[in-house]
Amino acid sequence: MAILLQTIFEFEPIANIAKSPLAFWAHPSSKVNTPEELINEIKAKQRPINFAIGGGGHKLAVEYLTSKLNVSGDKVETIMYKGPAQALLDVMGGHVEFSVTPVAVGYPYVQAGKLKLIGLASEVPIHGLEKVPL
């Protein structure tokens, strides 16, 4: 006889293991260095700006940004990857202009000089990254 569990009712979370806010990334040679410069780039370009994304939540961050800027959807093109690491590889390779992925995925590449951190999609500063624009 099989035991049927309704996991949503049978288990309770006991700890938050990890939290990694989303971050906006660019190739180190990009002229964009801050969220404000990214906004100006999106508004000024005649063609869509490409964002490599590795998940649905990442796409929502880009959609939220464009809605706040009150720009049409044709100003930004999101390119879906199988995951955030693959998305960042194409930014580092110069194939895609920008990316939105968790900060924990991209920051080691910043330390290696292969990626530029433009800003964080967070309401509060992150420990160790207090100088990064929000």
Q: How would you name each of these model-derived features?
A:
Residues M1-Q86:
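Hinge/capping helix and adjacent helix->loop/strand transition within the periplasmic-binding protein
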Residues F9, K19, G106-L134:
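C-terminal lobe and pocket-closing loops
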Residues P13, E37, L89-D90, P108-Y109, ...:
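Well-formed, non-transmembrane alpha-helical positions, independent of function
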Residues A26, T101, E130:
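A conserved hydrophobic position in a structured secondary element of the catalytic/binding core
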Residues I42, Y64-K68, A85-S99, A104-A112:
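Short helices/loops that flank or line small-molecule/ion binding pockets
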Residues A52, E97-T101, K116-G119:
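Paired acidic/hydrophobic, glycine-rich loop segments that form the ligand-binding mouth/hinge
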Residues G54, P84, V103-A104, A121-E123:
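Histidine- and/or cysteine-centered catalytic micro-motif in compact active-site loops
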